[in-house]
C-alpha cells in the first residue's frame, strides 16, 4: 500500500507553513514571558537585601534615632532606602500611588523659582532606577493592594513592560488616559500633547475596589435619555429578556407572545399596570417598550479616560506652587477607590503632598517619601496652612502663602483633618545636609505652631 501525501496535502496551508518555518526562525513558545534587557540590570535578590539604614525622627529642635517609622509620616530621604526600611519593618500598604520623573531630561522649579528636582535619567538608567524601586514597592504592597503609576508618554511602553515583568501581566487592571491640560493651539509640527497616563496593577487576584461614581453631563443625558413626556426625561428598554419560561411570563400578553427564545420580564398583570400608568411606549409598528425615567440621583461609573481632572488651569484653583502638582480631586478619587478608612497609603515620590492630603481627608494612614528639600517644606506648609489660589503665585504684591489674607488662610486650613504629622530623615542625609536639616526643623516648628 502506497504511503505519502496527496497533491492537496502537499499544496495545502499546513504544508506551506512547514516550508515557511525553514525560512524564518521559530517563534518563542506560547506563554513565554517578555523581559527588558539592558546593561546594569541588578539581580532581584540583591535589590531585596535588607539595608541597615538608620532613620532619625525630626523634632522642632532635635533629630534622634527611631526604631520604627510611624504612620502619617513624611520621610526626607532617597526613596530606595526608605522603601527598603519600610519593607524591613513589615509595613503593608493597600494603595501605592507614584508620580515619578517622566524621563523628560528637564529640571523643574516652583512658581517662586525654587529648585524642586531634576528629571535627567533616560532609557536604561531610568528603567533600572524605576525597576529597583518598583520591586521594593511590590514587597510592601498588601495582597489585596493596588499600585497606580502616573507617567508621561516618554517611557510609557517601557514601564508597561517593566510592570508586567514585576507584577505579572495578569495583574494589569487599567491604562488610564488623563487629560492634563487645555488645548495647545501653538503646536504646529505634531499633534498636541494633552494627556498623561496612569498604569494600574494589583498585587493579587482580588483587590480593594470601591467603584467611584459621578454625575453624568448634559451630553451623556441627552443621548441616554432622548425622549420626554409630562413625567420627565426617559429612555426605552425592552420588556422581554433572554430565555424560555413556561409560566405566566412565557405566555400571551395583549394577544402576543414574547419573541422566540425569550420571555416577558414581568407578569401580564404587572405589564397591564405599567401600560395603564403610561409607562409602556407603543411604537408605530405595535412594539411595546418600557419607559425608564431619569432620576435626580442618577450616577455613572468612570471610564479609563479622565477629562475632568486637569492640573491647575485657572487662577482660583488652590495649589501649593510645586511643579508637576497633580489635581487634588483626582487624588481623592484614587485614594477612595482603592483603599478603605484606616488603610495605609504610600506615595514614594510625594512632591507637593497631594496623595498624603487626600489620604488624611479620607481618614487613611499615609507615608510620603521625597528627597527634595523643597518637597519636604511644601508638604509641611500644606499641612500647616493649606494651599493658595493659583493667582496669588503670579501676584507680586503677595509673598505666596505666608502673606495671604487671613480669610484665605483660614479657608485653606479647613482642608486639613489631622494634627498627626511626623518627619524622618536618614542618618546620612542628616549628617551631610545640616543646613537643610535646620530648614526642615524650622518648617516643622511652623507646622506645629499653625496646628495649635
From Swiss-Prot:
Its EC number is 2.1.1.72. PANTHER family: RNA METHYLASE-RELATED (PTHR13370), TRNA (GUANINE(10)-N2)-METHYLTRANSFERASE HOMOLOG (PTHR13370:SF3). The keyword Transferase applies. InterPro entries: DNA_methylase_N4/N6, DNA_methylase_N6_adenine_CS, N4/N6-MTase_EcoPI_Mod-like, SAM-dependent_MTases_sf. It catalyses: a 2'-deoxyadenosine in DNA + S-adenosyl-L-methionine = an N(6)-methyl-2'-deoxyadenosine in DNA + S-adenosyl-L-homocysteine + H(+). GO terms for cellular component: cytoplasm. The keyword Phosphoprotein does not apply. This is Type II methyltransferase M.EcaI.
